[in-house]
From Swiss-Prot:
Keywords: Disulfide bond, Growth factor binding. Shell. This is Perlustrin. Residues 1-82 form the IGFBP N-terminal domain. InterPro entries: Growth_fac_rcpt_cys_sf (IPR009030), IGFBP-like (IPR000867), Insulin_GF-bd_Cys-rich_CS (IPR017891). The keyword Membrane does not apply. One of its GO terms (cellular component) is extracellular region. Disulfide bonds join C3-C28, C6-C30, C11-C31, C18-C34, C42-C55, C49-C79. It comes from Haliotis laevigata. Transmembrane segments: none annotated.
Amino acid sequence: LSCASCENAACPAIGLPCKPSEYVYTPCGCCPQCPLELGQPCGSFTQRCQFDLWCLRRKGNKIEAYKYVPWHLDFKGVCARVDV
């Protein structure tokens, strides 16, 4: 992943209505977006899930969950609640 300067970023319109205090940012950190909701697909190159959710996937008998999915992983999951 190579990030250009945010000065020239063409940010997409913010999707679902959310408060500015809830904004999360695209992987390069330039564009504010609303966080993903329960059940929405998430991964390395999406915005984060809502603050009380994790990006989760099942892999065989194992469950992997990330609060902040590292950009360098090939990770695709679904926003879900996780009891730790």
